[in-house]
Swiss-Prot record:
Residue positions where Phosphothreonine is found in the record: 196
UniProt cross-link Glycyl lysine isopeptide (Lys-Gly) (interchain with G-Cter in SUMO2), position: 60, 89, 183, 194, 424, 429, 435, 439, 560, 567-568, 584-585, 620, 628, 650, 658
Gene Ontology cellular component terms for the protein in this record: cytoplasm; nuclear body
Domain RRM per the UniProt entry, residue ranges: 451-529
Compositionally biased residues, Basic and acidic residues: 219-228, 391-401, 427-444, 520-590, 609-621, 632-696
Organism: Mus musculus (Mouse)
Origin: domain of life: Eukaryota
Pfam families per the UniProt record, alphabetical: RRM_1, SAP
Gene name linked to the record: Safb2
Protein's UniProt name: Scaffold attachment factor B2
Sites of N-acetylalanine modification: 2
């Protein structure tokens, strides 16, 4: 490769510049820009403008003018240019969209192309980039200028190409067919892949495990030789112009599809179909090695069944990723165009492929079986796609493709002499290796029967790398993966480890069973479902079937019988039912082609391989070891159709009667189940109804009790209020009673006091009978006299005869009796005085002398008003009767019959204040004047009981009380007295 910055190394200044031509920087495509940047060890990522700017800077650093530098570009054939121009737009677009093809470009050898594909494989499958140096340990082939010279001299004619290939450098021819170096490289690549596989993420581990299984078993297989058949020749003629670099690109695509089968199978199929259409126009002859023409033939044949199966899988829901597919298809077309342009790399490019190649002497393989397998798989492809475990069909197809890739077939008879010689050698070698291959397959199948280990009880955080590192302590680990139950993710984790030998597997069980990993106790045991054993039996059946079509093979009957036995064993494993219409369809499909055994092989191996899908096998009651390679939607869509394919495989077991009987039993069980379910539902509804009724009754009873409780509470409150009211009334009554008793007691005390005062008063009156002087000025203070009193005429009382017999019979001994009689009489007449004065006392205490107690005789104040003028003015009672009243006592008893009822009203003066003042004035008048002889001399007054009225004049006339207005005292000789027709106005009572 040219050194950057050197003029001699630059293609623009090399010796072939004139032949190849140059282009300016602005005319370069993205891939050319990246090639120039790669030469200078610069970054090749980014779009076209970024790449162009980066290259300009590189030219400026080299001291060149970017716009004036002419960049050489290899002269490819017209047809190749036509094809590249046809896809140039898609190439540039893919280059801008995806930076993964940064190492692939024109003008470089096949090693770089292989590195590009290997890098893409590394990125797609999750293998670390550190693998690249180990995997690509094949020496670099040739210099860039040598390759450019060969490309410049390339011509359309096969002879010219053969002549040019004869002139290849020794370095290219040295590595073209180096058997030992290639085998060592292949072993190193396989071991590196195995070691690095455990570091992948969990979703990528199943696919990589497939790759390891394929590499570990296929690369060591020795495929038998197969003579070129009539079916091979047309394909070989149509594709003989394809170089080995095209094969490298296709093998690279196959390697990618192994890494991501669910995403890239469809795009690979479409790419191969497009390539087959375009290969008719590509007449590039490359016959450096015998593998080149037959490789294209084999791929043309092998892609057809892949196309059918992958299209079926891609049509399933969830098999999308169309944008990614388109980008990868663009990238693949570009690499294939580069491989065609660099076809002179020949065997060198083939040797640079680390995997998928076999010993050159043994590379005449089974291309003749491929057309037959194609026809069989075209018929069987829908069944394979709809099998109960659809991912296994893809796995088997990938194995088939790898077999076809590794076992490079012999060229057609039109090839050169060297090709014919190689064909003969491979034929002889193949015949010698038939029996060793069969024995090797059987030995490997028996050897691998016990090397699969099932690890249970793993922690959810356990990864495949942990299992790989743990089990590698006790032997060589072929593959390790962690599987889970897809129907309940995260529930439990299991591990599936494949050891290199069964002895190592047994050793791992003895050392690792019931040990701790990540805090969980793990159990290691032999896998019950042996996918590797079934795969080996499938592969053995495949190899034996490939021997059948040769006309000189003595084994077809034996192999077919063996395959029939395998088929029946697989059918017996299925427990599902199959309808009669499925059987008819299968019979029709079986009649379409005589090679039904071949396509049934694909289907059965596919259905077996799907045991590695992450599911739980309900019929077996254990986890089924599987690989989750597609989305769940695709799994569901495939599982929804698996009963058809399973039914087709059981056409030799169940008859119509058995099917009907089985379906009838199933329907009967279904009916019984429905009846039981209905009965249970009815009982449940009845219980629920009863519970609802009970709840309703309970609620109603509770409401009734609540209402009654409220009523009782209201009654209790009402009774409490009534009780409180009664208590209040009782307390009020008792209070009134206490007050009444107190009042009665007070009244009794007052009566006693009054009686005592009366007794004291009588005793005092008896003790002293004082004559009080006439107080003239006291009359002025009387407020009851509104005007001055007129002087009475002296002849006022002249006409009143004065009875002389009133005091004749007075007896002093009756004075006490007279006093008591006067008091009783005054008490009896008090009611009339009160009625006359307008004073009404409803209480009975005022009707029996109580007026006297309150007014006249209260507290002894009634009779001491005479003592002074002040007391007279205050009006605190009547003055006591004069001592002369004793003289009236005896005479009063004689006058009692002669008194009229008006006397009491006229004389009763103990309640009004002006009455006793008048009587007092009368006393003064009576006492002051000279009275007649019958009045006691010196006593000066009248009786306190008011027997005589006040005269009102100073002459001292004694006016008898009977002559007063309003009634008075009538004498015993009434008829002899004449009343005064003109009474004195002072004696007229004013009420």
């Amino acid at each position: 490769m040219a050194e950057p910055g050197t003029g001699s190394g630059d293609p623009a200044f090399g010796p072939g510049a004139s032949e190849s031509g140059t282009r300016r920087l602005s005319d370069l495509r993205v891939i050319d820009l990246r090639a120039e940047l790669k030469k200078r060890n610069l970054d090749t990522g980014g779009n076209k403008s970024v790449l162009m700017e980066r290259l300009r800077k590189a030219f400026k650093e080299e001291g060149q003018e970017p716009e004036e530098v002419g960049i050489s570009w290899g002269a490819v054939s017209k047809r190749a240019v036509k094809r590249n121009t046809k896809g140039s737009k898609m190439e540039e677009e893919g280059s801008e969209d995806n930076g993964l093809e940064e190492d692939s470009r024109y003008g470089q050898d096949g090693v770089v192309i292989l590195q590009s594909s290997q890098d893409r494989d590394t990125m797609d499958t999750g293998v670390p980039d550190g693998m690249e140096a180990e995997d690509l340990s094949v020496p670099c082939l040739g210099k860039a200028d040598t390759v450019n010279q060969i490309l410049h001299a390339f011509d359309d004619s096969k002879e010219y190409v053969a002549a040019q290939l004869g002139q290849l450098p020794a370095q290219l021819l040295k590595h073209a067919v180096d058997e030992e170096v290639f085998k060592n490289t292949l072993e190193a690549s396989v071991s590196d892949l195995k070691v690095t596989l455990a570091d992948e993420e969990a979703p990528m581990e199943p696919e990589n495990e497939k790759i390891l299984d394929i590499l570990g078993e296929t690369c060591k297989s020795e495929p038998v030789k197969e003579e070129g058949s009539e079916l091979e020749q047309p394909f070989a003629q149509a594709t003989s112009s394809v170089g080995p670099d095209r094969k490298l690109a296709e093998e690279e695509d196959l390697f990618e599809s192994c890494g991501h089968p669910e995403e890239e199978e469809e795009e690979e199929e479409e790419d191969q179909e497009e390539e087959q259409e375009e290969e008719g126009d590509l007449a590039l002859a490359s016959s450096s090695k015998s593998e080149s023409p037959s490789t294209r033939c084999q791929w043309s044949e092998a892609d057809a069944p892949l196309a059918v199966v992958k299209r079926e899988l891609a049509d399933a829901p969830g098999g999308g990723g169309g944008t990614r597919h388109r980008r990868k298809r663009k990238r693949r077309r570009k690499h294939q165009a580069q491989a065609e342009a660099l076809g002179t790399g020949g065997g060198a490019g083939m040797n640079c492929e680390p995997v998928g190649l076999e010993e050159p002497v043994e590379q005449s393989s089974t291309a003749a079986q491929l057309p037959e397998a194609t026809s069989q798989e075209l018929v069987r492809a829908p069944t394979a796609a709809l099998s109960p475990e659809p991912q296994d069909s893809k796995e088997d197809v990938k194995k088939f493709a790898f077999d076809a890739c590794n076992d490079v077939p012999a060229p057609p008879k039109e090839s050169s002499a060297s090709e014919g010689a190689d064909q003969k050698m491979s034929s002889v070698k193949e015949e010698q290796d038939i029996k060793p291959v069969i024995k090797d397959e059987k030995g490997r199948a028996s050897c691998s029967s016990g090397r699969n280990l099932w690890v249970s009880g793993l922690s959810s955080s356990t990864r495949a790398a942990d299992l790989k590192s743990l089990f590698s302590k006790h032997g060589k680990v072929i593959g390790a993966k962690v599987v889970t139950n897809a129907r309940s993710p995260g529930a439990r984790c299991y591990g599936f480890v494949t050891m290199s030998t069964s002895d190592e597997a047994t050793k791992c069980i003895s050392h690792l069973h019931r040990t701790e990993l990540h805090g969980r106790m793990i159990s290691v045991e032999k896998a019950k479902n042996e996918p590797s054993e079934k795969k080996s039996s499938d592969r053995r059946a495949c190899d034996q079937k490939e021997k059948v079509p040769g006309p000189d093979r003595p084994h077809p009957v034996k192999i077919k019988t063996e395959k029939t036995v395998i088929k029946k064993e697989e059918k017996l494993e299925r427990k599902e039912e199959k309808g009669p219409e499925d059987i008819k369809k299968e019979k029709d499909q079986d009649e379409l082609t005589p090679g039904a055994a071949g396509h049934s092989r694909v289907t059965k191996s596919g259905s077996r391989g799907m045991e590695r899908t992450v599911v739980m096998d309900k019929s077996k009651g254990e986890p089924v070891i599987s690989v989750k390679a597609t989305s769940r939607s695709k799994d569901r869509s495939s599982k929804s159709q698996d009963r058809k394919s399973e039914g087709r495989e059981k056409r030799d077991i169940l008859s119509f009667d058995k099917i009907k009987e089985q379906r009838e039993r199933e329907r009967q069980r279904q009916r019984e189940r429905e009846i039981r379910e209905t009965e249970r539902r009815r009982e449940r509804e009845q219980r629920e109804r009863e519970q609802r009724l009970d709840a309703f009754q309970e609620r109603r009873e509770k409401a009734r009790l609540q209402r009654e409780r409220m009523q009782l509470q209201c009654q209790r409150q009402r009774l409490e209020r009534e009780r409180l009211e009664r208590e209040r009334l009782e307390r009020e009554r008792m209070r009134v009673e206490r007050e009444r008793r107190k009042e009665q007691q007070r009244i009794m005390r007052e009566r006693e006091e009054l009686r005592r005062q009366q007794e004291q008063l009588r005793a005092e009156q008896e003790r002293r009978a004082l004559r009080r002087p006439y107080d003239l000025d006291a009359r002025r203070d009387d407020g009851y006299w509104p005007e001055g009193k007129r002087a009475a005429l002296e002849d006022r009382y002249r006409d009143f005869p004065r009875p002389d017999h009133r005091f004749h019979d007075f007896d002093h001994r009756d004075r006490g009796h007279y006093q008591e009689h006067v008091i009783d009489r005054r008490d009896g007449s008090r009611t009339r005085v009160e009625e006359r004065d307008g004073q009404y006392y409803p209480d009975d205490q005022h009707s029996h002398g109580r007026l006297l107690e309150h007014h006249a005789w209260d507290s002894g104040d009634g009779w001491h008003g005479y003592s002074s003028d002040k007391k007279l003015n205050e009006g605190q009672g009547l003055p006591p009767p004069p001592r002369v009243s004793r003289e009236w006592a005896e005479h009063s008893s004689q006058l009692e019959e002669q008194q009229v009822p008006v006397w009491h009203s006229a004389v009763d003066t103990n309640m009004t204040g002006h009455e006793h003042i008048r009587w007092r004035g009368a006393e003064r008048g009576l006492a002051g004047g000279p009275g007649h002889g019958h009045v006691a001399a010196g006593r000066g007054g009248m009786a306190g009981q008011g027997s005589f009225a006040h005269g009102g004049h100073s002459q001292g006339y004694i006016v008898p009380s009977g002559r007063l207005e309003g009634g008075g005292m009538a004498s015993q000789d009434q008829g002899g007295r004449v009343p005064n027709p003109h009474p004195h106005p002072h004696f007229t009572r004013r009420y």
